A protein has these predicted regions:
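Short-chain dehydrogenase/reductase
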Residues: 100, 148-156, 192-200, 204, ...
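Short, basic/glycine-rich phosphate-binding loops at helix/coil junctions
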Residues: 184-186, 223-224
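Short, contiguous strand/loop micro-motifs
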Residues: 5-7, 97-98, 134, 149, ...
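N-terminal Rossmann-like NAD(P)+-binding domain of SDR-like oxidoreductases, especially those catalyzing
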Residues: 1-185
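Pocket-edge positions in alpha/beta enzyme catalytic cores
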Residues: 60, 72, 99, 194-198, ...
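A generic fold-level signal
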Residues: 1, 94, 102, 169-171, ...
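Catalytic core of nucleotidyl cyclases, primarily class III adenylyl/guanylyl cyclases
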Residues: 188-190
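C-terminal substrate-binding subdomain of Rossmann-fold SDR/epimerase-dehydratase oxidoreductases
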Residues: 203-338
Length: 338
């Protein structure tokens, strides 16, 4: 693939920052658009430090028409990777309008501006939450969708919108990536997951328990129909996920139309499997307590990743032990985040 100028919305976020590092390493020019509502400006310095060159940065909201028009007039964007969005399941249940407004309405504005600028190549961050509670696992892309919470429904609406757009306007080329559960951190320990306040995701919560920031891990639900009663998920290393975006970008640049693939490892681990792996990686005990299930959570969710291998030539390489080791390295080097 020739060198591209890439707009990365939410490029200072957890998955976005790791992807920007890989895009820069592959020789592309990157423009990050981020309002830092859930990330830190320091991330951009860390990205530059790892990659040896700096992405351009526009501070602003990816759903703001004026910001987007200015950016697209200034930079010759070849393709866009759209990460920006609110992403906490529990918060989406409490604040559905904020989620529909930011995620769905914001994406409509982004697409209108890209259409206007003739920048009709897009890779979209979707989520395995669109599958809801699957009838069986592993989950294939042709399984029925039925998200069980507003966050998942925002992703589901955007997927439909992108498919409708590709039908109406055949010059669009769109890759939809359904992520499973990203964990881990860059091997340098310079960028990683840095949640504000109480973490919603398992890994940062576990790392905070390991360093004594939190007394114990709350495990939501011990009565699921799984091998140990705790929820089973497909954890994928964030660097593998970032490389999946590079593979998706190649396909988007080369083709037309819309397509959807899962990005997961194909292996399901329970919360307690995860805790054991982290204890091994860190040498620290992780005290935990089983509490009530969380609304909107499903029993088990892991990918059939074969379509991504076939279509994109991409496979996850890093195992759970590596994910835990890299997260522990990040936590030790950055006890207070950025």
């Amino acid at each position: 693939m020739e060198k591209q100028t890439l707009l990365v919305t939410g490029g200072a976020g957890y998955i976005g920052s790791h992807t920007v590092v890989e895009l820069l390493a592959a020789g592309h020019d990157v423009v990050i658009l981020d309002d830092f509502s859930n990330s830190s400006p320091q991330v951009v310095d860390r990205i530059a430090e790892i990659a040896g060159r700096r992405p351009a940065l526009v501070e602003g909201d990816s759903g703001n028409r004026d910001t987007l028009r200015r950016l697209l007039a200034q930079y010759p964007v070849d393709a866009t990777i759209h990460f920006a969005g609110f992403k906490a399941v529990g918060e989406s249940v409490a604040k559905p309008l904020a989620y529909y407004g930011n995620n769905v309405s914001g994406t409509v504005v982004l697409l209108e501006c890209l259409e206007e600028a003739g920048a009709r190549r897009l890779v979209f961050s979707s989520s395995a939450t669109v599958y809801g509670d699957p009838a069986s696992v592993p989950i294939r892309e042709d399984f029925p969708t039925g998200p069980t919470n507003p966050y998942g429904r925002t992703k589901w609406h955007i997927e439909h919108m992108l498919n409708d757009l590709a039908v109406a306007s055949p010059q669009w080329s769109i890759g939809i990536l359904r992520y499973f559960n990203p964990v881990g951190a860059h091997a340098s320990g310079r960028i990683g997951e840095n949640p504000r306040g109480i973490p919603n995701n398992l890994m940062p919560f576990v790392t905070q328990v390991a360093v004594g920031k939190r007394p114990k891990l709350s495990v939501f639900g011990g009565d699921y129909p799984t091998h140990d009663g705790t929820g089973v998920r497909d954890y994928i290393h964030v660097v593998d996920l970032a490389l999946g975006h590079l593979a998706a970008l190649e396909k988007v640049v080369a083709g037309k139309g819309a397509w959807t693939v899962n990005l997961g490892t194909g292996k399901g681990y329970s919360v307690l499997d995860f805790v054991k792996a982290f204890e091994k990686a860190s040498g620290k005990p992780i005290p935990y307590q089983i509490v009530d299930r969380r609304p909107g959570d499903v029993a088990q969710c892991y990918a059939d990743p074969s379509l991504a291998a076939e279509m994109l030539g991409w496979r996850a390489q890093r195992d759970l032990q590596q994910m835990c080791a890299d997260s522990w390295n990040w936590q030790q080097k950055n006890p207070d985040g950025y």
